[in-house]
């Protein structure tokens, strides 16, 4: 039986690293009270940068075990991903070990972080196609799902970098497809809210304009 990944490293490092992150990037974070303080929850964000998980972490004091691609565990910062409780995911196939670790987090009432697109969005679309992993894990464990939208540019004292955390929704009684569709819809809404307030890059505004024309 898989063990829940440790979180003591997260608790130790997060206050210092998030302070540095906040001072350097000056991100705007909305919806700080929307991540439940206890109980099983899956935090899901669109994915544009390796530091996206920091933006959700700024909104809660509870540790979030993020699922991260296996390549990160072979590079210079492998120690960091292991120490902070990230779950190593082999994206080349069905990773049963990663799935078991994720289920262990949720079955113990923990917080799991997933990027449903599976990789950073490098397409011309507003967001990439969602995989079913996040919704499947949430439904299996009857966990709450929290949609998060990240827009803007990662640069020093950024005026556009913004994270907006949406209200959590229950997956109880939902099919995996229904949960996934709702998550996708909610994140698009949050992205559009960010852009409506001026938080975004020129490319994101262009994608949003193109998306609105397609959807009517």
Question: What residue spans do the PLM features occupy?
Answer:
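Short acidic-hydrophobic, aromatic-tinged amphipathic segments that line or gate anion-handling sites
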Residues: 29-30, 87-90, 171
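Non-catalytic C-terminal accessory region of glycerolipid acyltransferases
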Residues: 2-4, 8, 99-216
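Short, basic, glycine/proline-bearing loop/turn elements
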Residues: 16-17, 83-90, 118-122
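Catalytic core of membrane glycerolipid acyltransferases/transacylases, capturing the structured
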Residues: 9, 22, 36-93
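Generic preference for hydrophobic
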Residues: 29, 43, 66, 86, ...
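A conditional alpha-helix N-cap/helix-loop micro-motif detector
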Residues: 25, 92-95, 127
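N-terminal nucleotide/polyanion-binding subdomain common to many enzyme families
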Residues: 11-21
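Short gly/ser/thr-rich secondary-structure transition/capping motifs
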Residues: 22-30
